[in-house]
């Protein structure tokens, strides 16, 4: 038998040879061990399932088709091997314990060579060539004759030696593996290793003595002992292209590629890439279908005879995989580049930025975009170029990023995204409207005495019940709670309020008959009374409320007073002695005269002037009207320590009051803070000038009044761990109103801030009140700077409605974040870009007044709001501007303003200025996933009208409540007694969800609420949690009810809503119907 070269010569060759994945009828591992030890019969057959020849040695051999009429015929023609180099090195491989289609660069190789053959003679090379090209089985005798023992046992000698050492130790020590491991010391291993013969002799000895153990050990590193033809078809098929190309590439080529681009891609990814490799080939000569591949013999012939396994189609596929992956990555990198480029300039909150990223990827990778991309990267020729053929990134820019970038310029942002809705009514009509819908002027001027009422919640509640009963004979609604919000949209749709994502989570829309009299909605019932029209002579409900005989010719303010221990009181006044808390404007003017213009009037250093005046006036306030350090008095006393104006959606707005919280990474130096707030003012005025084009706003002189929470100067008394909720938390449902209800996420109350560890802020004696005016000294606010910003509504405009003010605050925030003087100055110190709270403008929400402090759970007073001067550059009368900070009419929402030129009412601000990402997500969701079934339709199908709160309550009581109680008894038995004899009260009704409160049975002792299900708390808060039912439709169109709980404890998330469990109502209703 002729030989072309010796084995020793070929060992020095760099030729990697051909890799063959083979199979046998039976266990491939047992077959291989028998072959390596010379125990295999020569008649056994080996089948080639797939192969990879980097040198493409058989490309010059003509392919001979089988007879299409007989699937069993295979060509036995001797191949022309003149162009095939000799000797031919072939690695026979098995699966490397690949249990699934999971890939990864850090995983072991997917196939592993188990023996190596060198084919040298014509007959040997013809046998392997026929097996590779035509799928002809190769006989075991040929493999025995051609096996390269030197190369083969280089693969196994170390493993065989380890087996020998272990099995020898096992025979000495028995089957106690622990003892075996302990006995394998260095000397023992060395002595045993020296006597072990390498190569075929060593493996044969092991195999003959320990056949089962050796076979089991090899099966641990080689797969193929249990794989079948069906396994290959199901894993890599079922179509021919995927079965041939994906099998070869995934098992034999991917991890050997020099670039390694596709190494980490799993099998499904490779199969998906096969689908866009649309190169046409002739049908498989065997004519087999996937269902016919029931044996390795047929599978081998099917794969080897396939036109996908040879020629340019097979050679070009690995290159196409790399090019396709590079094309995909290029589009993704382009998207990532745009996002990284936008991030520094797109000043939005972290939550909104996360939505922005998700939406950006969705815009690029939705169904239509993916179809277009896959069409662009599909090839019909093996070497077709796909570089930059995809338009994925370009479409993303056109469809999404261009719109987003319009937010980066305040002029374009307002011009393209904001649609103010206004009505020009003429001065005469607007003046009458303003006088009827703004506070009496006497309420905002200082008087010698207080006229009004200030009582705790329980007393106010009794007063309201009695008064409303008397007013029924005058036409007052018998079940009226808050009165219809006259300025709110949808006022004629008292119950069904369409959800508007431009509203903040704190804004309020409420059904008209949510609660009967005696319910907890104290605030809104007061607002309805004080804003009701009077009869002739100025006598109306407000007179009866306060017991005043004199005429009241206009609305009155309502205040909420926070008290210690979580209590609260409510104030309605007609006259007030404001000097009990606010220094008189005269004292401020006198102090400025005393300074004798030492602060200067030049504009050379505006920041130093502002800093000096802020410090001096703060000292004046502390020495003139000092708040107590701790309070525990009556409501009459505590109303001069803490007072919160309640926003009345029925009234017109005279001042734009912004609640600003600037969350900090680190304390900011005083000079930088004053410079940043000056930029903040510029952003406000720029936004107002664009929104209100007919207003004459002079940027150099228009007044903006700033008030800042006093710094934390000491830690005299920290908050106790049992502080569970803010003293300013109103006991109504305003925190749930007008919020998109997310069953997986908590809803934070905007008032729950700085509730733990509040420190005292005191002004000490005059001698110790000297202030360090070092401009580089950091502000004492380490975590947050709290500001109250008040801007008079410019003439000729008048604003109405909470929605208008909330929208205006969002636009101002966007404008401020686009103001370079603000962002570049304070940007390094900002923790996030959510700085203006737009949730404080809901009907019934309250906001603390300047000059008043906060009262925490223990009655400690802190965080007093004091003037923070930002004097306009062209201020004509600086003294007048400073004194104006002390006038109550300048920092109330509904205080009257000059109406001589008022002629336009701004009643709404629409457009996509806010909630752009949410709106876009909703539109895309409806397009690609279908419109979700609305709650109103789901209830209508069950005979319930969403506009009828009584019907909703009856439906829940009759069909749902029993299931809830049963579930609690089964799964939460420790709390079951609390849920006996429950009643339900409808709290919030919206188009997409309904919130109902579970009211416990007071006869069993749970008067204040339920116990927390999630945690056990201290005795004082053991029964302070609230439980609710949330009725909504899930993503699958099923009507569901969620049982949620709100606990005020810090470990429960401080007032966040937590879902306890969900009940599917549809299934129960269907059973009852049947």
Curated annotation (Swiss-Prot):
Keyword Phosphoprotein: no
One Pfam match: Herpes_UL52
Gene Ontology terms: cellular component: host cell nucleus
Keyword Repeat: no
Site (Essential for primase activity): 659, 661
Segments forming CHC2-type zinc fingers: 1012-1052
EC primary class: transferase
Family, per entry: Belongs to the herpesviridae DNA primase family.
Biological function: Essential component of the helicase/primase complex. Unwinds the DNA at the replication forks and generates single-stranded DNA for both leading and lagging strand synthesis. The primase initiates primer synthesis and thereby produces large amount of short RNA primers on the lagging strand that the polymerase elongates using dNTPs.
Protein name per its UniProtKB record: DNA primase
Protein's organism: Gallid herpesvirus 2 (strain Chicken/Md5/ATCC VR-987) (GaHV-2)
